[in-house]
Amino acid sequence: MRRIVLFAAAALLAVSTSAQARDTRLELSLQELLSSQEARDAGIDGSVRFYLAGQPVRVAQRMGEDVTNKKTNAANKSDEQACRWVALSALKALQSGAQARGANAVVDIVSFYKRNEFRSSTNYECYAGTILAGVALKGTYARVN
């Protein structure tokens, strides 16, 4: 009887640990994404330029800050595919916000997943799970020269 109880407890422990949510962190190149056919297909048209924090840019006028927090279905996609797709959604939202304000760029972009800043002059941060992938970006709308 004791063996059965121990076996049942071990089985429950194994099931409960495998049921925990996956949250895999990826860093991916923003420039590679922006220059892809995927970006053009998603409507990233070049009318608004994107600059990660740390990239050199001459700002003529700052026009306010914004945060976008996008999620996408990650089922049946690789982590990288899901992250690229959701990053394009976040960039599209920033592009629309910039156009509405008369800005031609979004500068000082940082990843802002769960309100934690990640700064890189080359990469954005994405978190991929079993069901969802998410990208949060914070940036400043601007007119640049």
Predicted regions located by residue number:
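Sec-dependent signal peptide recognition
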Residues: 2-8
